[in-house]
């Protein structure tokens, strides 16, 4: 493959990089060389994934070559540490740490994305590059990788995890036992790149557990692929033994990273969870007291005693009592308390920092015990309540006492009334009976206390990012097709960022038609605000608008509504008036199902209907699975209609508290959004995400129709994605409906004659699906093959609920694809950008239902901030693809855009306490030659005379004297000999004055 020198690093790229790709790779390499962080935006179709992989691995390969020489020099330097006088313990220890620098080795890459299908697609890209021989591994869940016939049949991810742990602990899993003997087998060690499917195939062939075997590859891997939650969730990071020191962390598809960080630190517990836990402890205690142990786990040895159970039950009863005592004056809105309340609540039940590790270990043992018992007694629960309690304790007490100030500022406790549930069978209330073998009532009816939900919510995404940075990572790179506005993103994440990039889109003006439609064909204003939602004239005019557009748009038409209630209201009205039948006569209509079971069949029917000359119309909801997780490239989505702004529920407690948090923490310096700005931006993020369904690669074309007059507001336009704003002009206006009809007809006429039409291979087929069980990590993807002339067939690995990803995914890059665009300024691969939701993190987190609408949830367009950004994840549905057709011709137009680089955000740094961290930070901030000179001068100074001090000062002030390293220069004083410190202070003072 051709080699390009980018930022001083030779990069093997499939072809001569285009300007957007070169600019992107330069920023990536600069981050890696300097050990700094970057926020890089490059729209879909610009070859982001390919550029990211090639640039990062090119730098790694260069460092590997340098490291061979570096290790030799460091080993020789270590020999100088054997003795000598002077320097004091600090200097001696620092020198010893310096001698161990070779242990840091070459940094490794961790590539994280939201879903396993996105990771699989990235690995497929990697297989086609010059770096396919570099060692890689993907970390998957037991749900995806387990091949044990009994464990894999368990329903629910937590059940599989606990059953697997039990079998491994008892040494009854033959697949896991074979890992040690088979881990060096050529079939396993041979391939450099193995994705989920490859691991399963090799595991089945060798009868070896793919889950545990994959972990054997991590220490030697140059790049490790994993989903976000493995990286950002402290529980998952600990469980998977992920070491982050001196690693390069790449967070792809990072436009929803703030929400993920917040949810990974949040947790919920219900009164009913505590009551069930009490009941489960009681069952186990009865088994201990019984003369017939076969009723539970038989004669298996127990890892706990009856005293452990008695103590735990007493603590749970106290916790139940403490929750009952929490005041909720307003049952509808709930009550909000400071973060300290959760620690006080748990403290009343004697859950403390001192004993939490012991309690969590006991809960895990009880879960495994019940897993065994449930195999013999099917009526028993499997310890789900213990898992929820363990999650609560793990997340709450993960925040060390030393950071309680930040916890109080970043978290809130919100208490809601839990809907009462009557337990099965007769049960005496625990507090009434009081005995050790009593059972807890789920409703606590005898006490008159209502059941409650305790939410421990994090509103500061920077809290999770700070924990990540504290692991001594070398660099963090956040990238996505839409990250802007960058400054508020960086401010919320609170990380130092040295490199910024906003790449332009690769499509030109002739490929996209964007208009704001302010009135319908009957001149009725189109505005989907709170006061207009029940207006029959507005609903009718909106339907007539969709009807007229459906006559003009070929193939697929997507219509997005602000919420499910609004969608249902329009459907009912149109069916009653006959508009529904009129639209359906032009294009068959498909509605986004809220249930998962119906989704696959609905999407399959839609893609089949696209092949008909009429095409099809799909009506969905912003933040639904169609808007967030699917790719409607080419014929599957030639136009998208946005019917309104999807504001979050105004009265949702989490929305209210998030706005309060921003208002109370916003300063001129930190550049946080105001509460109103965040609220309005949430709506536009969802719009940007929905718009992104149709323009998916550089040869795609389509129309974007914004059917709400509020989109003409200048502040609102500024929130739209950068490439959309370019089509609306400096002063966007609502266009009359008549001219729009003429322009839209002409746009598609021109596009169909000038643009190359995709063939079946490129566009709608085959489908790639992912079948998963509800609320579990995604299962491995398998490509669905379609014989010529036949419909796509769908393979399902499981039967329960279905999640479809990468539908209609863009074909992988080919040098020929780029060669045909020789006349263009910009180019790029059709980088796969399959969008789907990240499986819920292990913690039980309450999410906002952004599609909830009632009389209390109003919205308006005031206070809009002039920024734009793409949204994260949300509600039901997801999809699949089908086929595509016809022939196109290219009309290539040069598209020259300017790359916008924002100034760095200054973040004050502190001097690392430990010697290792001190040296590691120096190494991450300076070049190799400078670090080597610093180390040599330090070693000579340890045992040298006064002239060695002069030599050290010359090097230290040269290497650390710049603004980026000034804090390290100040920290260097600790390692200077006592006699030399006055002179060091004088020189430092002179530097500060200069």
From Swiss-Prot:
Pfam families: ARCH_RTEL1, DEAD_2, Helicase_C_2. SMART domains: DEXDc2, HELICc2. One of its GO terms (molecular function) is DNA polymerase binding. Its main location: nucleus. InterPro entries: ATP-dep_Helicase_C (IPR006555), DinG/Rad3-like (IPR045028), Helic_SF1/SF2_ATP-bd_DinG/Rad3 (IPR014013), Helicase-like_DEXD_c2 (IPR006554), HHD_RTEL1 (IPR049909), P-loop_NTPase (IPR027417), RAD3-like_helicase_DEAD (IPR010614), Rad3/Chl1-like (IPR013020). Its EC number is 5.6.2.-. SUPFAM superfamilies: P-loop containing nucleoside triphosphate hydrolases (SSF52540). A motif (DEAH box) lies at residues 252-255. GO terms for cellular component: nucleus. Keywords: 4Fe-4S, ATP-binding, DNA damage, DNA repair, DNA-binding, Helicase, Hydrolase, Iron, Iron-sulfur, Isomerase, Metal-binding, Nucleotide-binding, Nucleus. It is found in: Nucleus. Residues 874-884 have a biased composition (Low complexity). It catalyses: ATP + H2O = ADP + phosphate + H(+). [4Fe-4S] cluster binds at residues 146, 164, 173, 209. Residues 7-316 form the Helicase ATP-binding domain. Gene3D superfamilies: 1.20.1160.20, P-loop containing nucleotide triphosphate hydrolases. It is an enzyme of class 5 (isomerase). GO terms for biological process: DNA recombination; DNA repair; DNA replication; male germ-line stem cell population maintenance; negative regulation of DNA recombination; negative regulation of t-circle formation; regulation of double-strand break repair via homologous recombination; telomeric loop disassembly. ATP binds at residues 42-49. Residues 861-887 are annotated as: Disordered. A probable ATP-dependent DNA helicase implicated in DNA repair and the maintenance of genomic stability. Acts as an anti-recombinase to counteract toxic recombination and limit crossover during meiosis. Regulates meiotic recombination and crossover homeostasis by physically dissociating strand invasion events and thereby promotes noncrossover repair by meiotic synthesis dependent strand annealing (SDSA) as well as disassembly of D loop recombination intermediates. PANTHER family: DNA REPAIR DEAD HELICASE RAD3/XP-D SUBFAMILY MEMBER, REGULATOR OF TELOMERE ELONGATION HELICASE 1. Belongs to the helicase family. RAD3/XPD subfamily. This is Regulator of telomere elongation helicase 1 homolog.
